[in-house]
Amino acid sequence: LGVFSALLVSLIGTALALIAGYFGGTADKTICAVIDIAMAVPSLPLTMLLIAYLKSGMFSLILAISITAWTGTARILRTRVKQICELPYIKIEKAMGVSAPVIMVRHILPNLKDILLTRMALSVSGAMTTESGLSFLGLGTYGQKSWGNILHFAFFRNSILRKQIWWYLPPIICISVAVMGFMLVGYYGRQRRE
């Protein structure tokens, strides 16, 4: 679930960043305004609202998480696209009349690879945390096996009052290790890039 959400987040963020960074002007201002508005809305309540509105299922959960998580990727990639568009060879290609999609695919996207992989690793960890939280609250995919669902069922079977801590430890440890692993991969990619 986290990987599919990260792929969708990267797709949305990259598309909007390419449009805003390459074309600039009104498109850039509009997309930046949408990003600012989307970042101002708290993501967890919005995700909960989207899940309540959409049909229950794995695709709905992936879509709801992706709709609320693309803003950071779009903002970072937009800045990098604007920097790349100022390079001399991009200006020469524009002056020669090369079409925008060709320039984007041939020259800009390969230069975004490192940032995109780093953001994907961080997006996976964020999606895993969000899914676990939503499943714990009972808004995840019912019947699917997830660490959040294990926590949900343990909590609603009064495991705390019965002092059955072993119901909580395995999913908490697994969530922590998985999220920490993806975060470290993301931070390693960022350190390597700098």
Q: What residues fall within each predicted segment?
A:
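Generic hydrophobic transmembrane alpha-helix motif, especially the helices
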Residues: 8, 12, 21-83
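Alpha-helical membrane-protein architecture signal
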Residues: 27-34, 59, 63, 70, ...
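Glycine-rich helix-loop "coupling/hinge" segments at transmembrane-helix boundaries
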Residues: 52-53, 81, 130-170, 174
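Transmembrane alpha-helices
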Residues: 1-12, 101-133
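Generic alpha-helical transmembrane segments of integral inner-membrane proteins
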Residues: 3, 7-15, 19, 67, ...
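Non-cytoplasmic
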Residues: 48-49, 57-62, 66-69, 116-150
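C-terminal transmembrane helix and the adjacent membrane-cytosol boundary/short C-terminal tail
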Residues: 58, 67-68, 121, 164-194
